[in-house]
Regions:
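Conserved acidic carboxylate
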Residues: 9
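Charged docking surfaces used in two-component/phosphorelay signaling
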Residues: 16-24
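Short hydrophobic/Thr-rich beta-strand motif most characteristic of the beta2 strand and flanking loop
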Residues: 26-33, 41
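Active-site residues of response regulator receiver
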Residues: 53
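The feature encodes the CheY-like receiver
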Residues: 57, 75
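C-terminal output helix
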Residues: 106-116
Length: 122
């Protein structure tokens, strides 16, 4: 069974690139573009990993991580934060489900390694 990854990102070009790269690596990938949509999508899709942008319409990445951490089932899903802001790393440092941080623009080779580590494929 393929492992499922949910991309929560509002930039269409980033979503398309991430989906292409991750599907080539053999993952099942879905995406959503707003924070409000994200929470229901996580509950419905049950991803093995979430790639989460910090700046989102409706609900930001920090709010989504708080919702996840407050839920017994969802709190165990690993998260990789994606952001163009280096300062975002400090914001998420205290959340155990945040496994890594990937700075935009992406270095795809590094992103794939981080995904595989977070999802347990390395």
């Amino acid at each position: 069974m393929k492992k499922r990854i949910l991309i929560i990102e509002d930039e269409t070009s980033s979503v398309e690139l991430l989906m292409l790269v991750l599907m080539r690596e053999g993952y099942e990938v879905k995406s959503c573009q707003s924070g409000r949509e994200a929470v229901s999508m996580i509950k419905e899709y049950h991803p093995h990993l979430i790639l989460l942008d910090v700046m989102l319409p409706g609900m930001d990445g920090a709010s989504i991580v708080r919702v996840l951490s407050d839920d017994e089932q969802l709190g165990s899903i690993p998260v990789i934060i994606t952001s163009a802001l280096v300062e975002s790393q400090k914001l998420f440092a205290t959340y155990p489900q945040v496994k890594d941080f990937c700075l935009k623009p992406f270095v795809l080779k590094d992103l794939i390694i981080k995904v595989k580590q977070a999802i347990g494929d390395l």
